[in-house]
């Protein structure tokens, strides 16, 4: 079937939402009412064309589902076949293995219990799960949520244990005998088995099985009608058959049982369900705004280096957008849930072919560009040599981290990090971008720039860039910020410096004349030198 795409189904559906701005403690966990509307027809056509273009580029998908939620607008598309041998089409009702997106469900469940005072984030996990044997170091709930607990993962030192069903006690026993790979807090070690420990904590505290707890407190309130633990014995005719690629051809996936990964990778859901989960997080219907912010804040190792992972979600800046996401990869499936909390967007994707992470990410990034990035001329840097390249990379990182964190903190649940004074931060960033210093040791200068967003550097690039974004939004309005992902970092800096001139910003918020001269040379634009 390579090169030939199968029949598709495109559906515009209503969405679920809850009254904005109401904290969790002021309302019960209930399913959101049906409201909202489809995207305008021209946007639906554009979304469909974008997905089709990726399918033409990557014809290995058998079935694919894509869902998009932006504020009060919703779109779901389903393409290809959920079961090639039987000729069954993929639909919005099709259920897919969620794989590691299950970790996001588990993190929500844990934080619900934290909000109720039934679990403490910084408690030793053994206070909740005494069946976990004592190790060389204690491991906290917080560290497990952020993959900082040093717990090994299946497959690293032993088999995956996926040949037959096990209960939660059996799943916990799979990892109990292994020593920690690292002292907790010192090293990021992605671990499905760490999330099994959290699943055991949910069961111990709630008195319910993990699956029962999710149904009552996560799936139900989010309107996830078809979500469940992925027990092969309870699958219905709507579940997608899985495939893998062998010598460029699709063949059926290896049959595995995922009960041994229950809280780290053992669920299934439809694309509507996954999109509903994303919407419930954006609306703070599952956990409070504060807890949502914790989930979306990247943790750091003890020496102050970011892991780019919060509690149940990875985070990163993308062209000035603050991305919160989790992917899933298992036999039978490739999945991705991507949230932009500062812009009220959720994107959900699922394929029943393994190894499609890059394809799903291309679709998601294309949707972001389509929906959120105003088209405009991009200011390209006219640069020469290594020093110019390092300066330009620094400008891009100030812009990317700063705009992303500003959007997340100003329009989402985030809190800007860092404790130092802003004038000092601007002075330090100016020194990092100093041509003379870069020319003396370009490799060392670039290395310092690449670390300057980290906690051990007091989040310098984040704090300076976020202040610039806030200044621009106050002076030019929020719509102006939407232009920068397309127009680029030079436009961001040029506009900021122009605003600073008009407002007579005090030094050192103007950077210095050397950097301003670089910007003039990079863009050819006439930026007036500082009057100070």
Protein language model regions, located:
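Sec-dependent signal peptide recognition
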Residues: 2-8
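N-terminal signal peptide c-region/cleavage motif recognized by signal peptidases
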Residues: 12-17
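Catalytic loop of the DD-peptidase/beta-lactamase superfamily, centered on the K-T-G motif
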Residues: 18-78, 203-208, 212-216, 220, ...
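Active-site-proximal loop and beta-strand segments within enzyme catalytic domains
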Residues: 30, 45, 56-58, 70, ...
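Surface-exposed patches in mature extracellular/periplasmic domains of secreted proteins
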Residues: 59-67, 157, 228-230, 290, ...
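Secretory-pathway/luminal and periplasmic proteins that interact with or process carbohydrate-rich
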Residues: 75-77, 132-140, 150-156, 211, ...
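Zinc-dependent metallopeptidase catalytic helix centered on the HExxH motif
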Residues: 377-420
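Pan-zinc metallopeptidase signature
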Residues: 414-532
């Amino acid at each position: 079937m390579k090169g030939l795409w199968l029949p598709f189904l495109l559906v515009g559906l209503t969405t679920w939402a809850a009254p904005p701005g109401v904290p969790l403690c002021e309302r019960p966990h209930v399913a959101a009412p049906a409201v909202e509307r489809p995207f305008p027809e021209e946007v639906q056509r554009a979304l469909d064309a974008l997905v089709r273009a990726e399918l033409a580029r990557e014809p290995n998908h058998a079935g694919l589902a894509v869902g998009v939620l932006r504020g009060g607008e919703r779109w779901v598309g389903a393409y290809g076949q959920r079961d090639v041998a039987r000729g069954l089409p993929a639909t919005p009702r099709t259920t897919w293995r969620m794989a590691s997106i299950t970790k996001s469900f588990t993190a929500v469940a844990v934080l619900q219990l934290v909000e109720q005072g039934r679990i403490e984030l910084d408690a030793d996990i053994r206070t909740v799960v005494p069946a976990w044997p004592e190790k060389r170091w204690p491991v906290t709930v917080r560290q497990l949520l952020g993959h900082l607990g040093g717990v090994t993962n299946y497959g690293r030192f032993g088999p995956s244990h996926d040949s037959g069903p096990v209960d939660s006690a059996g799943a916990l026993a799979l990892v109990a005998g292994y020593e920690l790979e690292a002292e907790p807090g010192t090293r990021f070690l992605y671990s499905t088995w760490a999330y099994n420990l959290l699943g055991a904590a949910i069961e111990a505290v709630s008195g319910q099985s993990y699956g029962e707890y999710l149904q009552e407190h996560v799936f139900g309130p989010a309107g996830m009608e078809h979500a469940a633990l992925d027990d092969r014995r309870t699958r219905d005719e709507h579940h997608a058959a899985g495939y893998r690629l062998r010598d460029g051809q699709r063949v059926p996936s290896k049959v595995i049982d995922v009960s041994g990964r229950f809280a780290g990778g053992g669920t299934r859901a439809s694309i509507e369900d996954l999109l509903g989960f994303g919407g419930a997080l954006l609306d703070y219907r599952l956990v409070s705004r504060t807890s949502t912010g914790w989930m979306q804040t990247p943790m750091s190792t003890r020496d102050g280096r970011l892991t780019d992972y919060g509690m149940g979600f990875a985070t990163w800046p993308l062209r000035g957008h603050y991305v919160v996401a989790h992917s899933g990869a298992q036999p039978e499936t490739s999945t991705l849930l991507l949230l932009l909390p500062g812009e009220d967007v959720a994107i959900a994707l699922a394929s029943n072919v393994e190894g499609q992470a890059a394809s799903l990410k291309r679709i998601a990034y294309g949707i972001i560009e389509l929906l959120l990035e105003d088209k405009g001329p991009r200011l390209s840097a006219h640069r020469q040599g290594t020093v110019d390249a390092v300066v330009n990379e620094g400008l891009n990182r100030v812009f990317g981290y700063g705009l992303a964190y500003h959007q997340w903190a100003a329009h989402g649940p985030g809190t800007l990090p860092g404790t130092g004074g802003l004038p000092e931060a601007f002075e330090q960033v100016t020194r990092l971008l100093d041509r003379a210093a870069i020319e003396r040791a370009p490799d060392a200068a670039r290395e310092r720039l690449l670390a300057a967003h980290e906690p051990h550097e007091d989040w310098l690039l984040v704090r300076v860039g976020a202040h610039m974004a806030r200044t621009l939004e106050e002076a030019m309005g929020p719509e102006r910020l939407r232009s920068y992902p397309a127009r680029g970092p030079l436009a961001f800096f040029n506009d900021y410096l122009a605003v600073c001139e008009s407002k007579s910003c005090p030094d050192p918020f103007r950077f210095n004349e050397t950097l301003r001269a670089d910007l003039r040379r990079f863009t050819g634009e006439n930026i007036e030198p500082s009057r100070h």
